[in-house]
Amino acid sequence: EKAARKEAMQKALKEATLVPYSIMELCLESLTVVEMGLGCTNTNAASDLGVASLNLKSAVQGAWLNVLINLGGIRDEAFVNEYRTKGEEILQKALPLADKIYNEILQSL
């Protein structure tokens, strides 16, 4: 029973990791959509793009914290390494993009 319980916990932790990881992917995708709106809106709507970039930045960071907490309990090193690497890659793209969007909006106001 202990082995079955441990196996079930490992499976649950992996599934729990995939949810915030998918949120990270969606945040990055959303940031690219927000970026496409730069320069294509009036000033009033432009501020909404800046707010969106801030919200998406905090969402991707929060999701990353959830990924990390779940990875900490997973014994499958290949899984841990894969999602740690993939998550870090998303962060390396998303955080500068969110900052770029925000700063461009800020300068345009």
Kindly label every feature range from the protein language model.
Residues 1-109:
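A structural signal for small-residue-enriched, beta-sheet-centric alpha/beta enzyme cores
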